[in-house]
Amino acid sequence: MINNSGFAASEITCDQFLPSFGNVLVAGDALVEKDPETVDGFCRALNKAIEYIIDGHVEEAVDMSIEKYAPTFAEKRDVVVQILNDVFVKTLWQSDYTAENGIGASNPEKWQALINKSKEIGNIDETFDAAELLYTPAK
């Protein structure tokens, strides 16, 4: 975005030091326990939308989003399309793991490695089981 605004900038991605894996959705334990249908429905809807975008509908999704929700991004449309194509579609939303387990699937081994690394570099005081954080929606 900065480069496209006429300013030269280099990028240091967090993945070089502390990787992230796709989308992160947060729901409290109470909501998950009280209304799992809503949590599951939201996850399924998001995954369906991501699959649709990946399947060649990036420009359509950006145009609809600008029109309905973010009209101030109209002048940045082409940059947003480029970012979605270059980052989200190619690497953030898809991986070998999601190819095998479906869009939106979380790799517990990678999350555990991230938790362990976070302890190692002092971001957290104690490690814990990644399974405590991961939720798999009903099919």
PLM region descriptions:
Residues G22-T38:
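A bilobed periplasmic-binding-protein/Venus flytrap-type ligand-binding module shared by bacterial periplasmic
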Residues K34-I121:
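Secondary-structure end/capping motifs
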Residues M1-C14, T72-V79:
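Ligand-binding "clamshell"
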Residues Q16-L18, K68-Y69:
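Glycine-rich beta-alpha junction loops
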Residues M1-S5, F17-G22, E109:
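Bilobed "Venus flytrap"/periplasmic-binding protein-like clamshell domains
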Residues A113-K139:
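Hinge/cleft segment of the Venus flytrap/periplasmic-binding protein
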